[in-house]
Amino acid sequence: MINEQLFNLYASRIQGINALYADLDAKGIKDYAGPLLPYCWEQKYLESKFRLVIFGQETNGWYCDYMNTEEEISKNIGMYKDFRLGTYYNSLFWQYAHRFNMELNGIDDLNFVWMNVNKFGSDSGVGKPEQAVLDDEVKYYNLLAEELAILKPDVCLFLTGPNYDQDIARKLTDVEFHSLCEFGEREAVRLSSRYLPRHSYRTYHPGYGNRISETYQRILNAILSDCKSSN
């Protein structure tokens, strides 16, 4: 079962996250929230035409307690489950994520998985935490490749924008970025890595993409077409 495998992964890395906490405590760094640990509605996900994982940048606030017991891991995952993929939120990110899933799969009913490139975000505002937090995540708590191995997605869509390409590369060290159709490298790229499915793409975060909505929709349509034409 996917959720059991994810839980076992997180439980096996308690030592790593404790090392992260200890290092950040020693540096006096407290302004961070996370980690974001996903839950999968397994039957819906597995029965979808395309098993889809959509990536954001980092959470805007999240779990803020030390997460170093199995009980706290369960509590963290429960927060994700209760969030229900932003069902009760009307942000641009969730509007575009749900629309893409609907257009890809013909149904949008908790049947994709949401993750973030960075598991930790700032606790006091929006955006990345301090660089030391990002560095320690890579050093002590880089789980992305293992999460992908468990989820086995058919499509990965990174709605992260070009300024997060380096964050992706730090998590998946063999990743390469390739041109996609007629779009410039900042607009949209195809990603290749032994950890990623063939259909892996990065484009703008909806917060920016919606400002250039005509171009953004062309990009998303091109990605959808590429997924469907070579499935």
What is the role of each PLM region?
Residues M1-Y88, L143, E147, E187-L191, ...:
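Active-site and ligand/interface coordination hotspots across diverse enzymes
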Residues M1-S12, E130-A145, Y164-N231:
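C-terminal capping/extension of enzyme domains
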Residues N76-N90, K119-V138:
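Surface-exposed cleft-lining segments at the edges of enzyme active sites
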Residues G78-D108:
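Signature of the catalytic double-stranded beta-helix
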Residues E47-L52, N105-L110, R190-Y201:
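Beta-strand-turn-beta hairpins that frame and shape the catalytic cleft
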Residues E58-W62, N118-S122, G161-D165, H205-G209:
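Short, solvent-exposed loop/turn segments at secondary-structure junctions
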Residues L144-G161:
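Proline-aspartate-enriched helix->loop->beta-strand connector
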Residues N105-S122:
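Short, contiguous, well-structured surface segments enriched in hydrophobic/aromatic residues
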